[in-house]
Amino acid sequence: MAGPGAWKRLKSLLRKDDTPLFLNDTSAFDFSDEVSDEGLSRFNKLRVVVADDDSEAPERPVNGAHPALQADDDSLLDQDLPLTNSQLSLKMDPCDNCSKRRELLKQRKVKTRLTIAAVLYLLFMIGELVGGYMANSLAIMTDALHMLTDLSAIILTLLALWLSSKSPTRRFTFGFHRLEVLSAMISVMLVYVLMGFLLYEAVQRTIHMNYEINGDVMLITAAVGVAVNVIMGFLLNQSGHHHSHAHSHSLPSNSPSMVSSGHNHGQDSLAVRAAFVHALGDLVQSVGVLIAAYIIRFKPEYKIADPICTYIFSLLVAFTTFRIIWDTVVIILEGVPSHLNVDYIKESLMKIEDVYSVEDLNIWSLTSGKSTAIVHMQLIPGSSSKWEEVQSKAKHLLLNTFGMYKCTIQLQSYRQEVIRTCANCHSSST
């Protein structure tokens, strides 16, 4: 019987074979101490093909490695291998850092535009008040009042952007988003007080007609107002940006509760678009004041045009501020935002796999544009182990598809309801 020495000699003869040792399914994994380091000089645990020249490499891939790869461990990292179709089909959502960086960049640009617009509004509003006082024109002052509403809206938007960066405290765990709502109420009340004063003066002028208007000052002020509002329109106009179509096919395009149409308008902002719409309204009003000033300048006997413009512009101010009041009331009463449909959201949640029922769904707004949801769902019997997957899908649906700011999802396994009879109700019914 051969001893251990014969076995060692046999293995050493096998190691002297010129055939390279590759890592494949048929190779033996023998890492015993009996083999010296010289015997393993051509083996590296990180290499797929161990060969010093191309002649030793096989013509077919071994263990998924390309035969033309260099005999260097780092070559696998340096080469750009083509991705397969399955790898290309994977679409990863951007990480939180990327989303935050993109949001900060967008907010910075929005703040710059709105700050410039607010400064221009403030300067010209003061100029209109001075010009209206010098011309003794209520129409000019009413136009300045309308500009005050637009200035208040821009200031509230800037306040909301500033508050969004503030962290919640132990006292105010939701943050300070509702401060925007409080500021909106105060600004609207101030506008209504000033509008009431101007309407009272307009009625007195209509009745008594004992006033004179400086047509020259009124005409110059109105002309400057038209020019300023044209500048504001160009400043706040966003129609010249490039469209980046990024359609989401999670929901049908005719969904009644889609937050956006699927277009990503670059640095497009609802706040800037709202300010642009207000600027267009101011432009129309300024043109009306300019026409009235032209009439009064060349036909002083038609000075009744001044209080008439005050009546018309007061209605315009009331119409533009009514939406602010309504949105404020809905937020305070914790109503569902107008752009969301509770029934459609519930149907979308029910379409998630392994969801048995949506027991409760509450949606409200912390402030304008920041919706919050709490949902309670039951899972179908036997699917309790999939709760993480269901929770992830529901969270993605609420945050990404419907644009929620925050959401809380409660899941529980299916439990058949047990009908319980209250003793008091039973006794009263009998």
Curated annotation (Swiss-Prot):
It is a multi-pass membrane protein. Disulfide bonds: none annotated. The keyword Metal-binding applies. Zn(2+) binds at residues 146, 150, 278, 282. Widely expressed. Highly expressed in the brain and in mammary epithelial cell lines. Signal peptide: none annotated. Keywords: Antiport, Endosome, Ion transport, Lysosome, Membrane, Metal-binding, Phosphoprotein, Transmembrane, Transmembrane helix, Transport, Zinc, Zinc transport. Residues 249-263 have a biased composition (Low complexity). It catalyses: Zn(2+)(in) + 2 H(+)(out) = Zn(2+)(out) + 2 H(+)(in). GO terms for molecular function: antiporter activity; metal ion binding; zinc ion transmembrane transporter activity. Residues 135-143, 200-216, 297-311 are lumenal. It comes from the Eukaryota. Residues 245-264 are annotated as: Disordered. Residues 240-265 are annotated as: Zinc binding. GO terms for cellular component: endosome membrane; late endosome membrane; lysosomal membrane. Residues 1-113, 165-178, 238-275, 333-430 are cytoplasmic. The chain crosses the membrane at residues 114-134, 144-164, 179-199, 217-237, 276-296, 312-332. It is found in: Endosome membrane; Late endosome membrane; Lysosome membrane. PANTHER family: CATION EFFLUX PROTEIN/ ZINC TRANSPORTER (PTHR11562), PROTON-COUPLED ZINC ANTIPORTER SLC30A4-RELATED (PTHR11562:SF27). Probable proton-coupled zinc ion antiporter mediating zinc import from cytoplasm potentially into the endocytic compartment. Controls zinc deposition in milk. Belongs to the cation diffusion facilitator (CDF) transporter (TC 2.A.4) family. SLC30A subfamily. Homodimerization could regulate efficiency for zinc transport. Interacts with TMEM163. It is linked to Defect in Slc30a4 is the cause of the lethal milk (lm) phenotype. Mice with lm are defective in zinc transport into breast milk, due to a premature translation termination codon at position 297. Only homozygous mutant adults develop dermatitis, skin lesions, and hair loss due to a systemic zinc deficiency. Pups of any genotype suckled on homozygous mutant female also develop symptoms characteristic of nutritional zinc deficiency, including dermatitis, alopecia and stunted growth. This is Probable proton-coupled zinc antiporter SLC30A4. It comes from Mus musculus (Mouse). The gene is Slc30a4.
